[in-house]
Amino acid sequence: MPDMKLFAGNATPELAQRIADRLYISLGDATVSRFSDGEVAVQINENVRGSDVFIIQSTCAPTNDNLMELVVMIDAMRRASAGRITAVIPYFGYARQDRRVRSARVPITAKVVADFLSNVGVDRVLTIDLHAEQIQGFFDVPVDNIFGTPVLLEDMHARGLEDPVVVSPDLGGVVRARATAKALGDIDIAIVDKRRPRANVSEVMNLIGDVEGRDCVIVDDMIDTGGTLCKAAEALKERGAKRVFAYATHAVFSGNAAKNIKNSVLDQVIVTDSITLSKEMAATGKVTQLTLSGMLAEAIRRISNEESISAMFN
């Protein structure tokens, strides 16, 4: 069996260290810095010839910097004769442009990034909760898209929810809401119907379902500015919801997210460490962060040992 080695870029160093601790190994020795003109500089400081290399790097903000770090690290590993290179991308950026709508003159950036990673020499990709599952098909290498739901469900079960109802923040999230509701004992779901006049601005229009006197659990794959989420929570409280919790795998938290969430009627927002939480978000007092390290460590172990990934969720 090839020697397994873990390396990390600068996007999520804390998560990378937690994964290494779970696997009882040390992070590999690599210097990831910048040249004086801002270009990415990578130096691998140990032998990786023939090794089973895993590079842990979310492509979150600053998205372009983190993506280039990942790409340059993959190239460095390939040129150093690594046996196999797996890109572990807890949060896969550029995933929201995955199709052209009505032949609009726009790029499909998810495909661009997939080609970028494939062409530079990655052998496999491990990620969590892709914004659109069909993005896996953009790659010419195997992709393991695992689910962060078990980590979130564990917190839901421990939270002592009273007469809970799972809420989808939009019509597109109904499948996720139904799956969560089933995992919580086949409980009720509700749907917030919204209209989005422009990017990152949303308006709640209608609520489908009964939430009066009940704890509401809003589920989504990511939270960006929090505009949709906060307006959904407001609509739920106006309809008599007792408490409103929001669960999401990816804490993008861009723009006015901290202000929006701090001033909202949300009781708590629960996210994972696929993206490092900023000090500003932590200071809101409304955000709880769970770790994906155990799940990712197990997935990495299984990939290295040629074991089934899907068996993790059976």
Curated annotation (Swiss-Prot):
- Which residues participate directly in catalysis? 194
Cellular compartments annotated: Cytoplasm
- Please provide the Gene Ontology terms (biological process) for this protein: 5-phosphoribose 1-diphosphate biosynthetic process; purine nucleotide biosynthetic process; ribonucleoside monophosphate biosynthetic process
EC code(s) of this entry: 2.7.6.1
Question: In this record, what's one Pfam family?
Answer: Pribosyltran_N
| Top enzyme class | transferase
The protein's UniProt keywords, in alphabetical order, are:
ATP-binding, Cytoplasm, Kinase, Magnesium, Metal-binding, Nucleotide biosynthesis, Nucleotide-binding, Transferase
Task: Relate the assembly described in the record.
Answer: Homohexamer.
Q: Which family does it belong to?
A: Belongs to the ribose-phosphate pyrophosphokinase family. Class I subfamily.
Query: What is the protein name stated in its UniProt record?
Result: Ribose-phosphate pyrophosphokinase
Species this protein is from:
Vibrio vulnificus (strain YJ016)
